[in-house]
Amino acid sequence: MNEPSDADGFAHVPVLLHRADDLLGPAITAVGDGGEGAYMIDATLGLGGHSEFFLGKYPGLHLIGLDRDTNALRIASERLAPFADRTTFVHTTYDGIEDALEQAGLPSTESVHAILFDLGVSSMQLDEADRGFAYSIDAPLDMRMDQTVGLTAAEVLNTYSHGDLARILSTYGEERFAGKIASEILRQREREPFTTSAALVELLYRTIPAATRRTGGHPAKRTFQALRIEVNAELDSLRAAVPAGLDALAVGGRVVFMSYQSLEDRVVKAELVPRSKSTSPEGLPVELPGMGPEFRILTRGAERASEQEIEENPRSAPVRLRAAERISRRRA
């Protein structure tokens, strides 16, 4: 079987592809030979690399692909055109799972057999200079994954109060110098509003102490992460998406989460771990009806990419992977 191809000129190597298949494949084939009758959600469709692999390997699988980026949906739908009779594409954030299932004619709970969340910024968004996600390239400060709605990163920088800027830098970027950076942003925008990434990167080089710059990675990394999360309300969307995804799984269904930073992984863990434990009072000789664990965790903590995977696909280096299988009906 062929590996996923490039699409629309964008080189795209799906992250942890074969590990995702190891985890999700058994749930797909348990429904029927070749995945006949099985439904999978790709909650972060992107360029469709993961989806192309699963559709190619499991000829009976129907895939529901979600993405908030209209350009990504266009490219993915073209890429997956050979599977048009087994795909449903929905323009939505990943917390729009319930609406996506309705469009596919499925109930919102216990109706799908595999779900993949490949979180963070897509390869295409990083590689498109004019999107403003990459601090290594001077570009308009947009950072919207869906460019049809919402504030841009420039508008956040130019309109937010000192307190709000410091809050998002500290909370979403875990930036030690959040207050100092916020003060410099306010001073600079009084002279000239922010429009491109180069001006922000220059400010961060000036503001973050030299000793920290030498040891803490690129000085813009945390601020750009914080702005991206704020602009796209990523964590709010994820907090709604994780329970919606878990609820959508049928008994025997499996889910894989790939997080690219600790904030995402904490959200996933906070929802997944409690639902994998019994709620029966301690000391009882038997499990009370409806109080047993809903899920079985399939990974030991958060798995990381192997050295070989990172060498072949450097974008897999920060990934934290968690997976689980539904083992009982939803709790009341």
UniProtKB/Swiss-Prot annotation:
Keywords tagged on the record:
Cytoplasm, Methyltransferase, rRNA processing, S-adenosyl-L-methionine, Transferase
Per UniProt, the ranges with Basic and acidic residues bias are 322-332
Taxonomic lineage: Bacteria, Bacillati, Actinomycetota, Actinomycetes, Mycobacteriales
What is the recorded function of this protein according to its Swiss-Prot or TrEMBL entry? Specifically methylates the N4 position of cytidine in position 1402 (C1402) of 16S rRNA.
Family membership: Belongs to the methyltransferase superfamily. RsmH family.
Q: Which reaction does it catalyse?
A: cytidine(1402) in 16S rRNA + S-adenosyl-L-methionine = N(4)-methylcytidine(1402) in 16S rRNA + S-adenosyl-L-homocysteine + H(+)
SUPFAM superfamilies attached to this UniProt entry: Putative methyltransferase TM0872, insert domain, S-adenosyl-L-methionine-dependent methyltransferases
Keyword flag rRNA processing: yes
A Pfam family found in this protein is: Methyltransf_5
Which EC number(s) does the record attach to this protein? 2.1.1.199
One example of a Gene Ontology biological process annotation = rRNA base methylation
- Localization, UniProt: Cytoplasm
The molecule here is called Ribosomal RNA small subunit methyltransferase H
Look up keyword rRNA processing and say if it applies: yes
- MF annotations from Gene Ontology: rRNA (cytosine-N4-)-methyltransferase activity
- Ligand binding (S-adenosyl-L-methionine): G48, G49, H50, D67, Y94, D118, Q125
Stretches the record annotates as Disordered: 302-332
Q: According to its record, what are the GO cellular component terms?
A: cytoplasm
